[in-house]
Design a protein with these regions (language model features):
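Short, mixed-charge low-complexity intrinsically disordered segments
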Residues: 38-107
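Secreted/extracellular small peptides and ectodomain modules produced from precursors
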Residues: 14, 21, 32-35, 61
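Short aromatic-glycine-(Arg/Gly/Cys) micro-motifs in beta-strand/loop hairpins
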Residues: 1-17
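Hydrophobic beta-strand residues in large extracellular and virion-surface proteins
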Residues: 5-9, 29, 33, 49-51, ...
Length: 107
């Protein structure tokens, strides 16, 4: 059975692109993450991938990372499935610029 994953591409600690993919196995997910990271790192050496997996309670949780720097801050280690409906805003939500209610966060 396919599982749903969100692959977040980080460059210098900020989310710059997000992909929503389905994978049959954990191995396939890890291969996708490695391939995506290799492609991005060809252009940006400071890139890493963080993978979120859809859980049974309809939330996405961090489940895997590739070349993810420990000094990078993760604003969202989990988020509800409803957040993905605003897929274009997902990078801003993961960067902590916007909350799930589309409200801009001033820091």
């Amino acid at each position: 059975m396919n599982k749903r994953y969100i692959f977040a591409v980080y460059v210098n600690g900020k989310v710059c692109k997000v992909y929503d993919w389905f994978c049959e196995t954990d191995r396939e997910m890890k291969l996708q993450a490695c391939a995506l990271c290799a492609g991005v790192r060809a252009f940006k050496k400071s890139a890493g991938i963080l993978v979120y997996k859809l859980q049974e309670d309809r939330t996405f949780l961090v489940c895997h990372s590739v070349n993810f720097n420990n000094s990078w801050y993760i604003h969202q280690h989990a988020f509800p499935l409803s957040t993905v409906e605003n897929f274009q805003m997902l990078p801003d939500i993961l960067n902590g610029k916007v909350n799930e209610n589309k409200e801009i966060i001033n820091k």
